[in-house]
Amino acid sequence: MLVQLEHVRKKYGSFTLELNMQIPEDRIIGLIGANGAGKSTTFKLMLGLIRSDQGTVEVLGRNAADLGAEEKLEIGAVFSDSGFSEYLKVQQLIPVMSRFYPDFQEKEFRERCERFQIPLNKQIKEFSTGMKAKLNVLLALSHGSRLLLLDEPDGGAGCGRKRRDP
């Protein structure tokens, strides 16, 4: 199993997340729900950023809280904030990613940036919300991850946005 959550419980104030979930290799699973439903909390549990109050969270065959640097290299993650300085140009992210990820695929990253019209020589702060979201996904895809965790990859627009008729 790529990911396994068994009898997991996490409580924040009056909110309690309870879940059981298994994600086998080579599967695409979507977590859909309203704001505050626990999607981001689930991803943070999988990344070992927070601990469950109860139950077990295993990722890549290990307890998520015990994942080492080598295992974390096999995970690509997108959150609403990339964590990179918005004053950087995309071009400047390439050596950073190459240092963090030995399997960073620079050629493919550059090709994808061109295909999705992400300019390499423009500061991230000049990007629209949609362009920032695309960049974050391209970065997560750029290092051969076994597991991709995409939390609001649309930049926070959410699945519940209202449809506007012309």
Q: What name fits each language-model region?
A:
Residues G30, L73-S80:
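ABC nucleotide-binding domain signature
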Residues G55-D66, E70-E71:
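Conserved ABC transporter NBD signature motif
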Residues F79-N136:
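ABC-family P-loop ATPase nucleotide-binding domains
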